[in-house]
């Protein structure tokens, strides 16, 4: 038998110019907001006396915002250009945070979650289109760096929320810090935003890929895989602190801050997992990370003390770290020539999954307890493994030629 050599090709280096650093920081601010928002829901529930089901409606409102923007983004970018679209994302996210933190009415805080999520999704869609457009063959590595920074800055979110509660300033201060960062970013960006448009992001240009036409069946299965990954991540970021309070007896501020173990694991997973993606089939790596998430969940779920539970959360984070970048990358590849449309639809998948999965978990928790409700996590991961095995996606570039495996988003 003849051994088949494994070809490993080094991807082009990323030229980190000013626009790239601003895009990285934009993703970082979104990561900070996202991981600070999760523990804030449990604290808002305590403050207002909501049930878990009612409080989880804020996650559903966020999901709806992501779905709406996911459908409309490509049309807005074609009219305004990508640079103005990114600035609109900053303004929209800031407005949503002011609504969410500045009012006590349930309907207004739900509206704030919807608007903030819409703004955050605009940032994600804009940056995820800009980096590959701007960097060409080095785009996947730029994407990996951007999302790695998002997870790293996300570490600060739960800590800021927990610290605010601990020192008596309240949980809102940690979230409002996002607005300060957005203001600094937009001042640094300046008035000229054309550098963010690129060849396919200017309103006068034709779109880079056809916006219509049937997408292959494999794309929809790949999008379902991403939905499973997103649903799992949101279940843990939105309600993980509640599980720590229920099982480990942590206080509100300590539980919120302890989510840093989950987010930290995700950041480490994205950095440490990159060599694996360059040496093994990305589908195999993705399935393995789902298995690792189940292992971490088992450690946390069977424990009733802070130490082992936090170890379990860190292992869960290691598994989750690579899942979203890999799942997004394989969905875009599976779109076969409609990459822009495929990227936009992944935001829809994320919105649907992040709205449905945490809501189901919260509803079950109100009736059976949060510990039992969290069994949704291994169920989602097993479903994800089966989907990856059922519909593998070869590593190809936009025109269908084989590319090095280390050119997949890591």
Predicted regions: what they are:
Residues 84-98, 284-299:
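Structural signature of the two symmetry-related core transmembrane helices
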Residues 68-107:
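Conserved MFS/SLC helix-loop-helix module at the cytosolic interface between two early adjacent transmembrane helices
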Residues 337-370, 377:
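A late C-terminal transmembrane helix in Major Facilitator Superfamily
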Residues 112-150:
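Cytoplasmic helix-loop-helix junction between adjacent transmembrane helices
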Residues 49, 81, 102-107, 136, ...:
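Helix-breaking motifs and short loop linkers at transmembrane-helix boundaries and internal kinks
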Residues 137-138, 145-197:
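Helix-loop-helix hairpin linking two adjacent transmembrane segments in secondary transporters
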Residues 37-38, 216-268:
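Extracytoplasmic gate region of multi-pass secondary transporters
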Residues 69-82, 269-282, 365-366:
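Helix-to-loop junctions at the C-terminal end of transmembrane segments
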